Regions:
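N-terminal, positively charged/glycine-rich alpha-helical extensions of SAM-dependent methyltransferases
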Residues: 8-35
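Conserved alpha-helix/loop element of class I SAM-dependent methyltransferases that forms part
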Residues: 40-67
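Conserved hydrophobic residues forming the short capping helix/wall of the S-adenosyl-L-methionine
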Residues: 53, 57, 109, 210
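Conserved SAM-binding loop
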Residues: 60-64, 69-176, 203
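Acceptor-substrate binding/catalytic loop of class I
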Residues: 168, 188-205
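Alpha-helical membrane-targeting segments
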Residues: 172-194
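Short alpha-helix
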Residues: 197-214, 220
Length: 222
């Protein structure tokens, strides 16, 4: 893990969650491993993000449509979204609180000759002066310690007129059955304990937090 001692950092970084994902770090790029569901889901996520960004910024170019877009991928893991965003032309900065995840992601991107700025940090601690056109918070808010403070910190990094994506698991009986009972206990796609249902969020709760941080909620999907 990153050597972070600042007290405010601990209000978003959940050590238990970081240790959990650090143990699985070597499997990020194994399409048949513990992150198989993410690999299957990834093409949909990439297409969704790309199309939303193109529409939001009224981009006309078909070739590398995200060229010169400053993008921040928060909780990047092994870089499963960072790399495709880079290939689409975005200038990618990707952060994760697990040093092991950052090492795996950096190694993989260098192997594929992709220029991605990987940093082991969190949104409230990131030592960077610029702001971003696009911020990705994909399947991360259910793993942080203080969602209000986390999203407030993310908002400070977003340019005026920028767009932030927040994806998480809805707090429903269906999500408990599929994401925890099914994926962890029956199919064994994910290690038991990967998700905690208490940390799942209902859309209205997430919208409330975002509005509190002066974000305009454009669309809720899923």
């Amino acid at each position: 893990n990153c050597n972070i001692n600042n007290q405010s950092i601990m209000s978003t970084i959940n050590k238990k969650e970081i240790e959990k994902f650090s143990k699985m770090a070597d499997e990020w790029w194994d399409t048949e491993g513990k992150f198989k569901p993410l690999h299957k889901f990834n093409p949909l996520r990439i297409s969704y993000i790309k199309n939303k960004v193109i529409n939001h910024f009224n981009i006309k170019s078909k070739f590398m449509p995200l060229k010169n877009i400053e993008l921040l991928d928060i909780g990047c893991g092994g870089g499963l979204l960072s790399e495709p965003m880079c290939r689409l032309g975005a200038k990618v900065t990707a952060i994760d609180a697990s040093q092991k995840n950052i090492d795996v992601a950096s190694f993989h991107s260098k192997k594929n000759k992709l220029n991605i700025n990987y940093l082991c940090t969190s949104p409230e601690k990131i030592n960077i002066k610029k702001k971003f056109d696009v911020i990705l918070n994909m399947e991360i808010v259910e793993h942080v310690e203080d969602i209000d403070f986390f999203l407030k910190s993310c908002t400070k990094l977003l340019k005026k007129g920028g767009i932030m994506f927040v994806a998480t698991l809805n707090k429903t009986l269906k999500s408990y059955v599929f994401a925890i009972v099914g994926a962890e206990y029956i199919l064994r796609w994910l290690p038991i304990g990967t998700h905690e249902w208490e940390k799942f969020l209902k859309p209205e709760d997430l919208i409330s937090i975002q509005k509190k941080n002066k974000l305009i909620v454009e669309k809720v999907d899923g």
